[in-house]
Regions:
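S-adenosyl-L-methionine-dependent DNA methyltransferase catalytic core
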Residues: 1-26, 36, 66-76, 85, ...
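Conserved hydrophobic/aromatic beta-strand scaffold that supports enzyme active sites
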Residues: 122, 208-210, 226-228
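Conserved S-adenosyl-L-methionine
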Residues: 181, 203-215
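Core alpha/beta nucleotide-donor-binding catalytic domains of modification enzymes
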Residues: 1-171, 181-193, 200
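Intrinsically disordered, low-complexity regions enriched in proline, serine, glycine
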Residues: 186, 209, 238-239
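A short acidic, often aromatic-flanked loop/helix-cap motif at beta-alpha or helix-coil junctions
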Residues: 108-111, 213-218
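A short catalytic or substrate-binding loop motif that flags glycine-/basic-rich loops and adjacent residues
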Residues: 43, 218-221
Length: 301
């Protein structure tokens, strides 16, 4: 049983499926409308709005507005903004919210709404306030507890876990964190250590990895930091867990040869359809992207 917090489009579920693991996503936590609608398409297919075909716009708004959803992943969408959307779009949103069993805004979740018997809780919390890219825009707030920013939503996971424990419910057996490797930098290390200490206090054993996607067959170099947290019922289990991680160190595994880019991208631009798709996918011309381009020797060849 898996719960995906900050689920986005469901990359964790996709990985479990690819690995052939028997799993069930019992809930997701995602307030970004585009993200959970995409999640529904990717994992469940075309939206089924049949149960809601007779819902009026007013009925849909009465259900959607209290959920505190977002259209940009940054700020809550207002009732006025939601009302401007077509009734068909609102039906798709409501259908996706229900079919993904979405608990919505993580700030509204507690031990009462969090499911029981959870094996794995994943939490790829927002990276904008931790990333080097954010630092370029003078954003250094990171995961400070009082930052009141997107990356600081990490501490909502702490709140939920504490409320579960204090009210006698079972904690998830495993936690899986993923974020940018800058979380280990001098600026953010003390906060990250605080988080690890809090998890240990709750009874978890933590193992941190920094891994490059290119070492696992991906056609790109993407370094990310992961933390696996294992709930320990007793000290004997801790000895076993420590030995397991020692024997199965992901940072020491044999590196796989990256797959060729052509396997993932349609690069035959003599095909007018592929060329048009490539043109549409070009990133917007912004000052920050120009700065990146001009400072990259490979792109500027």
């Amino acid at each position: 049983n898996v719960v995906e917090a900050f689920s986005g489009i469901g990359s964790q579920a996709k990985a479990l499926k690819k690995l052939g693991i028997d799993y069930k996503v019992v809930n997701i936590l995602e307030w970004d409308i585009s993200a959970f609608v995409a999640y529904d398409f990717i994992h469940n297919g075309a939206p089924d709005i049949t149960p809601y075909k007779n819902f009026t716009k007013l009925e849909l708004l009465e259900r959607l507005v209290p959920l505190n959803l977002s259209s940009d992943g940054k700020n809550p969408i207002s009732r006025i903004a939601l009302k401007a959307w077509s009734v068909e779009a609102l039906r798709i949103i409501w259908a996706a919210y229900n079919r993904t069993r979405n608990l919505g805004d993580i700030q509204k979740v507690d031990y009462l709404t969090f499911p029981s018997n959870v094996d794995v809780l994943t939490y790829s919390f927002p990276c904008q306030d931790l990333s080097i890219g954010g630092a370029w825009h003078n954003n250094h707030s990171g995961i400070d507890r009082d930052a009141n920013n997107r990356s600081g939503l990490l501490w909502e996971v702490e709140r939920i876990l504490e409320s579960i424990q204090m009210n006698g419910k079972e904690l998830p057996r495993f936690l899986l964190m993923e974020n940018v490797s800058n979380i280990l930098s001098k600026r953010h290390a003390s906060n990250f250590n605080d988080w690890k200490n809090q998890l240990e206090r709750l009874g978890y054993y933590n193992k941190v990895y920094t891994l490059d996607a290119s070492n696992f067959g991906s056609p790109q170099r993407r370094v990310r930091t992961f933390m696996v947290s294992v709930l320990l019922p007793n000290n004997d289990i801790q000895t076993f867990v420590e030995q397991y991680f020692k024997d199965n160190d992901l940072e020491e595994i044999a590196k796989k040869k990256p797959k060729k880019l052509e396997r993932f991208l349609r690069m035959d631009y003599s095909n007018p359809i592929y060329k048009e798709e490539a043109n549409i996918s070009n990133p917007n011309d912004t000052p920050s992207r120009r700065k990146i381009y001009e400072g990259n020797d490979i792109l500027n060849k």
